[in-house]
Amino acid sequence: RRIKEELGLLIGVQTPPHRDLKRYDHLKEIGVNRVSFCFEIFNRELFEEICPGKHAEYGLDFYLEAIRYCAALTGTGRSDEPWVTNGEIIAGLEPPGSSIRAIDWITSVGAIPTVCVFRPLVGTDLQDHEPPKTEDMIPVFKHLYESCMEKGLPIGLAPNIHVSLVMLPEECRGFSQKRYL
């Protein structure tokens, strides 16, 4: 909290789900503003295949339970402290329709999706996996923006976040023909 007060920063934490979900209440109490869970893949079979460590240690259901729990903390506690929950997926590791279903689930519980774009890296298990085609990603990005807007989720609150592989909902505005107030 002292760092926040002195520097005026928002504090975010990316974490695997903890077995004691009440720990997230504590993170909020000490001034954390954003908690993010990178479960990568919404398709259960692909999650088990591509994320064997996450599958063995936590399982997809526990990631989703943690996201749901943390999203429900929005609106509790200090009103002057923003609290946002993110569910992070990696588009291009599963069919676009599965990524869109992930976005729908994440926004349905009041969390904000973060969509990373898969890029194969030399020396990794997925180095030979083809990167997604741009035309396959456009509907995912369009849906990311529209789903957040239709659910009235707070996007664009954290200034100066620029990550080359991540599309934030507000950055996807240009893919949509819909205009929101």
Regions found by a protein language model. Give the residues of each.
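Core AdoMet radical
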Residues: 1-66, 86, 114
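Auxiliary Fe-S-binding modules of radical SAM enzymes
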Residues: 75-82, 96, 100-181
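Conserved strand-turn element in the central/C-terminal portion of the radical SAM core barrel
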Residues: 10, 14, 18-19, 53, ...
